[in-house]
Design a protein with these regions (language model features):
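Amphipathic alpha-helical dimerization/coiled-coil segments
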Residues: 2, 75-106
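N-terminal helix-turn-helix DNA-binding core of bacterial DNA-binding proteins
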Residues: 2-38
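Beta-hairpin "wing" of winged helix-turn-helix
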Residues: 47-64
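Exposed loop/turn and edge beta-strand positions of beta-sandwich/beta-sheet ligand-binding modules
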Residues: 67
């Protein structure tokens, strides 16, 4: 059975699926707070949906900042994201359907 992801985790996964990003990029892309994004990145990586790598210390030093950890989506993450998006799109008509009033039987 596929792992159920929270809406926040799906937003993070979707943001990273657009290319390799570091944590603050994901915060900007999702408009989620860091206290949500960084734990989600950690869980998504632990569960095999993301992979990460550290940038070169040389590059970071040249720019006068600490090294960034870059995240990319895995094949498993892409499959999970696409499955979740298909499910959400299938549910959209149900969520947005107008319900007509029901008349009393009495």
């Amino acid at each position: 059975m596929a792992k159920q992801l929270s809406v926040s985790a799906l937003r993070v996964l979707h943001a990273v699926a657009g290319g390799t990003h570091y944590g603050f990029d994901v915060i900007d892309l999702t408009a989620l707070p860091g206290g949500t994004v960084y734990p989600a990145l950690s869980r998504l990586e632990r569960d095999g949906f993301l992979s990460s790598s550290w940038e070169s210390v040389t590059v970071a030093r040249a720019e006068g900042r600490p090294p960034r950890r870059y995240y990319g989506v895995t094949e498993q993450g892409l499959r999970t994201l696409n499955d979740a998006l298909r499910t959400l799109h299938a549910l959209r008509p149900i969520r947005t359907a107008r319900l007509s009033p029901v008349k009393s039987r009495s």
